[in-house]
Amino acid sequence: MEKKINLIITPQEYNQANHNELWNEISEKSDGITIILNIGADFFISLARGKFYRVKEAINGPKILKNNLILLRPFYILRPEISNNMVNRFNAKLLKQSLKKIVKNIEEYQINVLYYDGIWPTFLDELKLNTKYYYYIMDEVRNDAHNNKTNLKRTRHDKIACEKSDYIYLMSTKLIDKRREYLHKLKVIGNGASQKEYDLNVEKLNNSVGIIGNIRNWVDCDLLTRLIEKRQDIHFGFVGNIESDMQEYMDGILTTYKNVKYYGKVSKGEVHNWYKKFDVILVPYKQNEFMKATRPIKIVESIFASTPAVSIPITGYEECSFIRFAKTVKEFSSEIDYLINNKINIESREYQDFIKLNSWSYKAEEILNEFK
């Protein structure tokens, strides 16, 4: 039997990544070792942004997380995502040296690569290893989120990645539309979650909705403002990082409306208790083709915390008794009332099936079924 290694390239810092529980499940269900390739350190970006810990971790070398799970912070001259072909040839040599410190005879292995950014197959081809590619598409990367316009650079990388990959995992059915020539190797996976132990003393915020996660320009500010204004009887709580281009908006609604409060940034470990605090989780995104293809992880995480959600219509989820869709202020208002008055029945078949089919354990099995 051919020896195999899983190589997972993270799209976010490992400790804060939405999918780190998935990667842990993959390692537990695999016979060989799994190497997590964290966001790289380099001479320029890491130092310019004050990310000195990245350089330190790259120098320290790989870290064993479990028996067969290894976290590697690679070191590059310049991050591969923004490097030209010449620089990336050197970057590839540096990466291969780092991998060989973990597995000396890595040339004898088949490497199954799970990755999230279309640049990686072309880059990893430079390693000259026995590599199979598995592409996980999170959003409609061919479009920009805030205005839905085509992004030519990402479109080019995405097409190359789709062509080179042995299998392609999709966040939603909508992502099939621009990739129909690859139907034979497409599978809709979506986000997952895990059951958590919650603090017993989580204090509920009565008559409340929560906007949780990265507060960015995906939000339909006009719709949300009118909803806040219409529902003065509802407490609107924001939890998460505020991106710079949303700071002015947040300052405005916090100053203007007494029913709005910002609770600050919280760690990934703390966020699950915040899902429990609110009656409903709100996803008031802009409505365009990009957004329609999304599957926000906050929805599945909130359902696992037994808190229902109301969102704009998206193809990443099916509407049900605890996930409601709304397009207008009136519809959002109505669905909030419905969900506050109709709590999730955690004993129902509908809920239990959702938990089973959306667990990270189940998602890991779906992915590994396609690894050759």
Regions found by a protein language model. Name each.
Residues 269-274, 281-303, 311-321:
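Nucleotide-sugar-dependent
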